[in-house]
Amino acid sequence: MGWGISRLIGLKAAVLLSVAYYFHGLGATLISFPLIYASMIAMLVCIASHPAIDLPLLLGKASDGSFPLWSWIMFSPFLLFIHMFVLLRRFVKNEPLYTEIADGVFVGGWPSSVEHLPPCDPAVIDCTCELPKSPTLSNNAYLCIATWDTRAPQPSQIESAVRWAMRKRSQNKAIYVHCAYGKNYFHISILDDELCCFFLCIFS
């Protein structure tokens, strides 16, 4: 599976620390200190998202998709960075946000506005730990299985998501499964009218 997000954020930490060292050498302490803090947070995320550790609970995302105040304060350099990175990447790539891979089953990226949701009032399975639940989803059935980008959910999370999705499909609800960018792979099979979802996240 590779290092994925861990490698990216580790590189970011190194760059921030180098820039902080440069400004510190110029005597610009007020600039270097925030950069050092952002570098420390990035390194913490790098370690927590490494496959050997894989600790998405670090960021404190709740089951309702919200982040507590302490998380916004402590991890603001990372949370704001990833939020802006997702929006910028979406603007630059200009790719379809979601794809219907089976009847009533959609996979895609983080829906930041109502235009980014399939037009069928779907039940939503959120596979991100870095992005908050969008106000767009306030009226949608919602399940959060917090997962680092480019990482796979735990088997117990997959099993829970499968059962939840099967219940929603039995109620004739469409399902929207999303990660941050919509670039993860999702394998779907339908057996005896029961929806079985197997999530395989790969670095892309």
Where are these regions (language model features)?
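Broad hydrophobic/π-residue packing in well-ordered secondary structure
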Residues: 12, 16, 41-47, 137-138, ...
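A phosphate-binding catalytic loop at a beta-strand-loop-alpha-helix junction
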Residues: 172-192
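Non-catalytic regulatory/accessory regions that flank a structured catalytic core
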Residues: 1-103
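Cysteine-based protein phosphatase catalytic domain of the PTP/DSP
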Residues: 60-61, 67, 71-177, 195-204
